[in-house]
Amino acid sequence: MKFLDLAKVYVRSGGGGAGCVSFRREKFIEYGGPDGGDGGRGGDVWAEAAPGLNTLIDFRFQQHFFAKSGGHGMGAQRTGASGDDIVLRVPVGTEILEEDQETVIADLTEPGQRVLLAKGGNGGFGNLHFKSSTNRAPRHANPGQPGVERTLWLRLKLIADAGLVGLPNAGKSTFLAAVSNARPKIADYPFTTLHPNLGVVGVDGHEFVMADIPGLIEGASEGRGLGDQFLGHVERSRVLLHLVDGTAEDVALDARTILTELEAYSPALAEKPRVTALNKIDALDPETLAERRAALEAEIGGPVLLMSGVSREGVTEVLRALWSRIAPSRKPAEDREDKPWQP
């Protein structure tokens, strides 16, 4: 399935049905009086977060969503039928924005969460409502209220506990494939990963979700490479895993490039808890490894873990470091496991 994280939709709620002008016509009743019914209410347009979805690709093929209008009122005080609602099923983590793409209407972060996008119009009153002591036979009724029309944007930000960041070919996809059942495309050329990938990772009996996004390069915030459009998918992460290619000539420069791009995208993202790991250590001799680790620690001002996604050396230590930062922010129910009953 193709990945799409931004879609434009046009929604319109149903208009209310018109009220009816009608009079009671019955044998032996000379002045039956008004009996026109009210119009039915128009249908609403809703958005609902649905589990199991992870792309907005469905909205590439259908952009227009119109709810049904209410039925018109009828004689004998019969109210028109209400119009059917229409529901847009979107992935969990979808933001709904106004046409300007800046004003956030809603952020659907929980399965089953719903938000009203366009309210249906009320039905018009039939002539029965206008009967009074001075007007015993009103000959007018209200039209129904028109529906609401809106142009909206849907923007998906995947929800993951940990987000992978790094330059192209830093080994992010290899790492994700090594620790989860995710099978991202892996090759020895830049930008092999063209869209985010999710994987469920387990360590010491705990599980969490990890997101791998396309690599960043210098100037990504200005549109170079694939730009920084995918950073939104790690914006919700509780911790970032910054992978640095140990075979690079200047690991400190590589780390600085990523930190600069994170800061340019969002200062809040740059301040997130972060684990830094020097990858591909299986390709380095001990002396070079020690030099590059020291240079990287001096650049970031903190400890650097060593690992190899290919040989899996040091992978467990990295996962434990991630979990130690994820666990405090987890709700107790999120990590509760079913245990056998004990008397």
Curated annotation (Swiss-Prot):
PROSITE patterns recorded: G_OBG (PS51710), GTP1_OBG (PS00905), OBG (PS51883)
Residues involved in Mg(2+) binding: S173, T193
Enzyme Commission number, as recorded: 3.6.5.-
Pfam families attached to this UniProt entry: GTP1_OBG (PF01018), MMR_HSR1 (PF01926)
Residues the entry annotates as binding GTP: 166-173, 191-195, 212-215, 279-282, 308-310
Annotated OBG-type G domain residues: 160-327
Gene Ontology CC: one annotated term: cytoplasm
Source organism, top-level taxon: Bacteria
GO molecular function, one term: GTPase activity
Matches recorded under InterPro entries: G_OBG (IPR031167), GTP-bd (IPR006073), GTP-bd_Obg/CgtA (IPR014100), GTP1-OBG_CS (IPR006074), GTP1_OBG_dom (IPR006169), GTP1_OBG_dom_sf (IPR036726), OBG_GTPase (IPR045086), P-loop_NTPase (IPR027417)
Residue stretches making up the Obg domain: 1-159
One of the protein's GO biological processes: ribosome biogenesis
Cofactor list: Mg(2+)
Alphabetic keyword roster: Cytoplasm, GTP-binding, Hydrolase, Magnesium, Metal-binding, Nucleotide-binding
Chief location bin: cytoplasm
Subcellular location: Cytoplasm
Functional summary from the UniProt entry: An essential GTPase which binds GTP, GDP and possibly (p)ppGpp with moderate affinity, with high nucleotide exchange rates and a fairly low GTP hydrolysis rate. Plays a role in control of the cell cycle, stress response, ribosome biogenesis and in those bacteria that undergo differentiation, in morphogenesis control.
Assembly and binders: Monomer.
Entry-linked NCBIfam families: Obg_CgtA, PRK12297.1, PRK12299.1
Family: Belongs to the TRAFAC class OBG-HflX-like GTPase superfamily. OBG GTPase family.
Descriptive protein name: GTPase Obg
Recorded name of the encoding gene: obg
